[in-house]
């Protein structure tokens, strides 16, 4: 939602369908439906809301604790309730109302307790680019992967644009070692794969 008109990463770039949940729901519903007709999977973003922020998470830490409100959840709630969303992307924003320690992408409270349990989302949760500075300047690769996966993220995004390129082998090896050391549950990985496989069957 385009809440903060001075927001330079979402609002001034025209990356939102409107200022109100009514506008966002109306126009994004049309967009999602047309994509579906073309067998294209749509992704709602950036959960739990980025339109009220004052900073850009590509560049560093973004705190929305004083600007965010629950009305930013309304479009997500609508799409989930009406079973019209296959994927949601997390935001790298920090909100102490939702988690006192971690930004949303790395937060179990946001991605599992709020999104899964409270709102009832059962689709695929994908991270935003994990090399954006809001994450990569504060967490190393092992910490990022462990926290993101354990928070409930099913699909990890590395764009290799903002930081030193990371290979798939590095990611897989790191996750594998964390499973062996019982820092990540194998069941969590299996469940994530099941969600992704289920999504791909819809194409």
Predicted regions and their residues:
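Second-shell residues forming the walls of enzyme active-site clefts
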Residues: 23-178, 183-187
């Amino acid at each position: 939602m385009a809440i903060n008109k001075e927001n330079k990463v979402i609002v001034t770039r025209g990356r939102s369908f409107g200022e109100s949940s009514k506008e966002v729901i109306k126009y994004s519903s049309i967009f999602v439906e047309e994509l579906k007709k073309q067998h294209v999977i749509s992704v709602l973003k950036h959960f739990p809301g980025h339109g009220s922020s004052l900073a850009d998470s590509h560049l560093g830490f973004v705190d929305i604790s004083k600007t965010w409100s629950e009305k930013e959840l309304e479009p997500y709630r609508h799409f989930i309730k009406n079973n019209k969303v296959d994927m949601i992307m997390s935001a790298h924003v920090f909100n102490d109302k939702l988690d006192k320690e971690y930004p949303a992408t790395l937060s179990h409270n946001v991605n599992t307790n709020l999104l899964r349990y409270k709102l009832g989302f059962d689709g695929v949760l994908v991270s935003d680019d994990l090399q954006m500075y809001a994450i990569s300047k504060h967490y190393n690769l092992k910490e990022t992967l462990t926290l993101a996966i354990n928070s409930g993220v099913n699909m990890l995004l590395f764009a290799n644009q903002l930081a030193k390129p990371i290979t798939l082998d590095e990611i897989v090896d790191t996750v594998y070692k964390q499973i062996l050391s019982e820092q990540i549950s194998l069941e969590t990985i299996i469940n994530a794969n099941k969600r992704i496989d289920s999504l791909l069957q819809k194409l």
